[in-house]
Amino acid sequence: RRGRAPATGKPAFFNAQELERFVVQRGFDAVVAQRLWRVVIRALRDGGGEADDEVWERASKYCIDGRQKLPKVAVELASQNFRLFSSKLAHVAESKDTQTTKLVIELRDGHRVESVAMRHKSRTTVCVSSQIGCAMGCQFCATGTMNLIGDLDTSEILEQVALITRHECARSR
């Protein structure tokens, strides 16, 4: 988060170090953090554009199937102690041909970044931001006209992917 104020409040779920530290402090094996990620990503993918509490509930139900070897209480503790998203979707713009979608994502400190989903016949390509602003100064790019404000942390980058996943799944329903 170079150049930015430290994050406050509940930690972001997609911060791998915080999540692993949390599960180990609660007496779980560190691998539980990876399993939590898997069930939450699955819940996001399967649920589409649902509210965060519904994603946590679905993730909790996935513990029951036994394949994840994840204690249900681990999901409950994570849902109480982490924000699923510290960022939020501020704006969505669809291209006329509906093959490209730009998402404006507002970070917890109020800064905004852009992510883009480009749909092709056999795949979807995603472009995510790793910084707020840019030092290059390219006049054709909105981000390039801003000064470099700071770097995103890993969880903010991963949240962009998760928010795009959530949006694309809801869009395809």
What is each stretch, according to the model?
Residues 58, 113-173:
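Conserved Radical SAM active-site core
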Residues 1-124:
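Flexible, acidic/Gly-rich N-terminal and inter-domain linker regions that tether
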